[in-house]
A protein has these predicted regions:
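Generic structural signal of hydrophobic/aromatic residues within well-ordered alpha-helices
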Residues: 5, 47, 51, 135-139, ...
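Transmembrane and membrane-interface helices of multi-pass
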Residues: 2-250
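General structural signal for secondary-structure boundaries
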Residues: 39-46, 114-127, 138-147, 236, ...
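Short coil-to-helix leader/linker segments, especially the first N-terminal amphipathic alpha-helix
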Residues: 244, 248-287
Length: 679
């Protein structure tokens, strides 16, 4: 009986050997495809420890390739010889199922990295409300989905051959042991040794669960290189980390915990308990208008309109000539580093509208927020100054329920381009082409100007710079040889890169034309231009002569942010070079509101000096740009190159917690969302 078990568990061990090799091959492919360096020369110690540590971390799942057949095949097979005879067939079948799981997880990671330049993270959960047919469109048209699916069969055949090879390796014969007691002792030692071996591998070469591999214990040599640190993590452990951590801990907080975090941040001296809800704790008083009250205010949010392309290093690409016409205007005030309120589109738009951070809670999807009376909401507060507010979206506002959420924030009109541009308007899966959308929106603003009253606020949000990049750019005047004649040839002549970069140019041109049209029609207008978020352009520009490195933190995360009005210049920003989405509303009120006007804002205006900006995801000072994902940050300023990276404790964690807990508290108390302060 035990001789059958002895032979069988060795087959389990042979099956187990195949999968760390498969995971290492996947890791090698990932590094080959996405490595930002032209050569690995001088980095081989990093590569070695990346694979070494990744091997042990992968045992979080791979160790079960030994345990499961051990329990389901070898143990019962020891008592049922006929069942044991089927063992290798069952192992092959189970191994192919696990191989398919690894293949799909790896393919998903490769796609995810191409879009977000990161391994699986919480964005996976933020996509829960994404339009499924749109995801399918991207999968098949941008990410070679058909090839991925067709690749399953040859991949499985190759895995079957590999598994059969390992299962065919010679086994150790059961030793001849004289005497029953020594034989039972040997058998017991083998059985216990199998269990011990499982735990030793499962815990990453240790018998202590607390010492098993995790992100914090990646060798520092590897962790300092962000790319190889990410390459260390196998796909299933990465997905496990996403799934085992809730998107937001807000639901598990107590009221006392949240109020204690909010209290240090409030600007109103009254106790939180005396206010209709904690959002009222952020009352501020305007010091007096700095400009003539504009009849039109335009908040323009460009899809992924990032600061990076305004940097001198990337001037040769000439992708932002439309925006630069305003950015370089002497009556423009701009910051050079900014924070978006969210890491993807909807949380940023929600935060800009509502005046509180979405914090990953998808407020626009919650019915309780479709009837909110938040005092911090930008259009609601502008109404107190006599402004009629309109939200213009280049897509369909019903996606994400913004047809419900935007009016609740105080918008008098919510206009959706998929309706007012007509059914035949050219569009991507996200929305109508920016040029068509903005031309039609401009015409409607001009046509209905009198009907909207003397003071108007227009919030416009575009969509076209979004994959898959299928806009026929040549039809709209894009020729890389004419647009970017000074760009390096490996960018200018690369068709794949040009689909991406050309779409950015296309969106910028539409933006510039709209701004010019509105400024000609309404020269006293106040314009605020920003992006919903930035984007890691490493996937597009790395491996080129222009960018022989990965994009740094600032380049990955900083959207554009500037203000334009005939009565301002750069000096209006009090020397500030940093800012964020949540500084926009208070800056507007301090520019236009009369002295004594009360408004509500989490953050101060940019008309007074600020030394830091915080969001749920990032922190920013004049000296550094960091995230709350890890302890690394990018030092800014003279003396530091674009690749500089430092490690240190995360600052402003209390402030971050307070902002997030404010949102969490309001989510848990929907009955407070309609509460208003008595006057």
């Amino acid at each position: 009986m035990f001789s059958i078990f002895y032979a069988s568990f060795q087959q389990d061990a042979k099956l187990f050997l195949f999968f760390p090799i498969l995971c290492a091959l996947f890791r090698a492919v990932f590094i080959k495809v996405y490595c930002p360096y032209p050569s690995l020369r001088g980095r081989w110690p990093v590569v070695f420890h990346c694979f070494r540590y990744g091997f042990w971390w992968g045992m979080d799942f791979n160790a079960y390739v030994f345990l499961i057949p051990f329990v389901l095949i070898s143990l019962p097979g020891a008592f049922i010889p006929a069942y044991a005879a089927l063992g290798d067939t069952l192992r092959l079948a189970g191994g192919l199922v696990y191989s398919l799981v690894l293949y799909l997880a790896f393919a998903g990671k490769m796609i995810f990295y191409s879009h977000f330049h990161d391994i699986y993270n919480q964005i996976v959960k933020l996509g829960g409300h994404a339009e499924k047919h749109n995801l399918a469109d991207i999968f098949f048209h941008q990410n070679h989905g058909a090839l991925i699916l067709l690749g399953i069969l040859p991949f499985e055949l190759a895995c079957a051959a590999g598994i059969r090879f390992f299962l065919s390796l010679s086994s150790l014969p059961y030793p001849e042991i004289a005497g029953a007691v020594p034989r039972y002792a040997f058998n017991t030692a083998v059985f216990l040794g199998c269990i011990a071996a499982f735990y030793w591998f499962r815990y990453g070469g240790t018998f202590w669960h607390d010492n098993k591999p995790e992100w914090d214990t990646i060798p520092s040599l590897v962790k300092k290189d962000i790319f190889f640190a990410k390459a260390t993590v196998d796909d299933l452990p990465a997905l496990e980390q996403v799934m085992k951590h809730d998107l937001n801990e807000a639901y598990s907080h107590t009221d006392a915990e949240d109020l204690a975090a909010i209290a240090p941040l409030k600007t109103d001296p009254r106790p939180l308990e005396d206010l209709p809800n904690p959002a009222y704790a952020f009352r501020r008083t305007a010091k007096g208008a700095r400009i003539t009250k504009p009849k039109h205010i335009f908040l323009f949010v460009g899809e992924t309109y990032l600061e990076q392309f305004f940097d001198p290093q990337f001037a040769c690409l000439n992708l932002v000539s439309g925006g630069k016409q305003f950015r370089n205007d002497p009556h423009t005030a701009a910051v050079t580093s900014a924070l978006s309120a969210g890491i993807i589109s909807r949380p940023s738009i929600v935060s800009l509208m509502s005046g509180i951070f979405d914090a990953g809670l998808e407020l626009n999807e919650k019915e309780s927020f479709w009837q909110n009376r938040l005092p911090t909401a930008l259009p609601r507060q502008l109404a107190k100054l006599g402004y009629h507010s309109t939200y213009w979206y280049g897509g369909n506002v019903t996606y994400g329920n913004f047809n419900q959420f935007a009016p609740a924030c105080g918008f008098d009109e919510v206009r959706t381009a998929t309706d007012f541009c007509g059914p035949d308007a050219p569009r991507t899966w996200v929305g109508v082409y920016d040029n068509v959308f903005l031309e039609k929106a401009a015409a409607m603003i001009l046509q209905d100007n009198d009907a909207r009253g003397p003071y108007q606020f227009h919030f416009l949000y575009t969509t076209s710079y979004h994959g898959p990049f299928k806009i026929p750019l040549a039809r709209y005047g894009y020729d890389p040889e004419k647009v970017m004649p000074d760009a390096p040839e490996d960018i200018r002549k690369d068709r794949t890169r040009q689909k991406n970069l050309g779409t950015f140019w296309f969106s910028d041109q539409a933006l510039g034309k709209f701004l010019r049209t509105m400024k000609e029609a309404y020269p006293d207008s106040l314009f605020i231009v920003t992006g919903d978020h930035a984007y890691d352009m490493s996937a597009v520009l790395s491996h080129t002569s222009l960018l022989p490195r990965e994009c740094n933190l600032r380049e990955r995360h900083s959207p554009v942010l500037f203000f334009n009005h005939p009565e301002i210049d750069q000096s209006i920003l009090a020397g500030n070079t940093i800012g964020g989405h949540m500084n926009i509303a208070p800056t507007v009120f301090e520019l236009i509101a009369p002295e004594g006007f009360e408004y509500y804002s989490l953050n101060p205006s940019l008309l007074e000096p600020i030394d830091h900006v915080v969001s749920p995801y990032h922190w920013l000072t004049r000296e550094a740009y960091g995230t709350y994902d890890d302890d690394f940050y990018q030092p800014l300023g003279e003396g530091y190159g674009p690749e500089a990276l430092k490690e240190g404790p995360q600052p402003f964690t209390g402030e971050r917690a307070g902002y997030m807990d404010l949102t969490g508290y309001l989510v848990r108390h929907p009955e407070l969302l309609r509460a208003e302060e008595a006057h």
